[in-house]
């Protein structure tokens, strides 16, 4: 009968549901069914003593023992257990509730009042007090489904009924819907009907725990005086063995919080850990979690695995305990009780991530959802100015030190000394050579970042350039004279064949040429120098040595060489004193050359030369 009531979609704290439980309870003799099971018989004095009297100091052991009347001490003592079953203590208010729900009083002597009902413990036909008989077409024995038609006939509801409208009853709350669903599920699986308890002697203790969803069998009927509710709720969780306290039938019992986890199972269906059996944890903790469980969360259609963050992020992120899951996943799939305060051990290899012993040192790490990463190294760890690929400029600035040191070794290894044979040529030199010499000066002017005044200073070099390019007329040469931006201009001239031995007449002509060059170059205040290098020339006569005139600044060093001769003409300011060596003797030149050989080469100048590889001759040309 109780199972049928629970399957009815009504609020268990409404008046019809309370009245149904009272009539079907064997503990109360003041209210019972009539002979046909279609009406109620209410003994007013006994009803007031059992259900409506305020709590008294008398003992409840004598309640219901007497067969006559209920106004004595037994009635007062019996009513002390359930003072709030009904909020009123007036019998007239109880009758008013019956009338409000459509009950009508039956006149005594009619067919419905043919005698007392077959209730147990009824010693007589309630001759000691008035007996009230009420009838309702929707309140019948063994038909609890009719209770949904009992409406509260207020003025508004009466108007609706008169207009033919349907008056909705109060919908069942969440707890009632849970009971209805669980009752229907367990009714099909149960094999025996619900067993009722006998009245007082047996105390209401904890019932044997039952696993699985909430079933009707977990609501045990208990009508003892010391229990405030006609039924007690036994929690489905194996950690809670105490009955849920209820104050009365007029209030909706608050259900305990039982959730379904992400696997769709109730707490009783999940194997729980015996470690927390006495803690009262409402949500189960999965057993053997660290090594064997591959717990999978499945929001919507995607499968998301619980994994620990990559070990590369351990050093940058020190605290994972307050990590919030992504917004794209529902919060219902991240119960905090499942993975609460679980420190990952070092042997957690069954999970999808790889855990190292360094990661286990963080005792407060929780498992969180990490978005997939394309690379194991975060991009933000790289510097912002990290070049993606080596550009041409970077390649140009790379200095091949091996080539520099190889050049130094070659300079020290050969004992030969070559000099440049300067030949003054008339204007009948090929126009291509003159054009090439003129091409040098615009390049020097354009490559120099100075203003137009610098260009005007370089204009007097035009005839000099024509003479420079005409020095090697009649020989096979390769001129690499692209001028760099440095103030020193290096002109490297290679010849394939040696020149003839110069004569004294040629030396005199060379002296005149140098005097002319000195007069033209001293007018230019630009602190730049022109270097001419020629290889493969044999050292012919001492007259060639004596014919060379060098103007050097003491602050600058001449690049020492045993294979290369230099003709350095420095264009300094007019007011700046220059050191003129004049026509030096061969012995003096060799002495200066030997002194310069004792010095170490200027590596800074060699590095600058090697940096400008496009201005430097190839090794094949050097060997020629």
From Swiss-Prot:
What is the purpose of this protein?
DNA-binding transcription factor that is essential for male fertility, spermatogenesis and meiotic prophase progression in spermatocytes under non-stress conditions. Positvely and negatively regulates gene expression to ensure progression of meiotic prophase beyond pachytene stage in spermatocytes. Plays a role in male germline meiotic sex chromosome remodeling and silencing through regulation of SMARCA4.
Subunit structure comment from the entry: Homooligomer.
What effect does gene inactivation have here? Answer: Male mice are sterile. Show impaired spermatogenesis and spermatocytes fail to progress beyond the pachytene stage and are consequently eliminated by apoptosis. Spermatocytes show aberrant sex chromosome remodeling and silencing.
Membrane among keywords: no
Enumerate the Gene3D superfamilies for this protein.
Winged helix-like DNA-binding domain superfamily/Winged helix DNA-binding domain (1.10.10.10)
Q: Where is this region: Disordered?
A: 52-77, 112-138, 186-214, 429-461, 572-605
* Name of the protein described by the UniProt record: Heat shock factor protein 5
Query: What is the tissue specificity?
Result: Highly expressed in testis particularly in spermatocytes (at protein level). Not expressed in fetal testis and ovary.
Entry keyword annotation includes Transferase: no
Keyword tags: Activator, Chromosome, Differentiation, DNA-binding, Meiosis, Nucleus, Phosphoprotein, Repressor, Spermatogenesis, Transcription, Transcription regulation
Q: Where is the composition biased (Low complexity)?
A: 186-197, 442-457
Report the gene name.
Hsf5
Q: Note the DNA-binding span(s) on this chain.
A: 11-228
- Which residue intervals are annotated with compositional bias (Gly residues) in the record? 58-77, 112-127
A Gene Ontology cellular component where this protein is annotated is: nucleus
According to the UniProt entry, its GO molecular function terms are: DNA-binding transcription activator activity; DNA-binding transcription repressor activity; sequence-specific double-stranded DNA binding
GO BP annotation list: cell differentiation; male meiotic nuclear division; spermatogenesis
Query: In which domain of life is the source organism classified?
Result: Eukaryota
Q: Which family does it belong to?
A: Belongs to the HSF family.
PTM-bearing positions, type Phosphoserine: 600
The entry's localization annotation reads: Nucleus; Chromosome
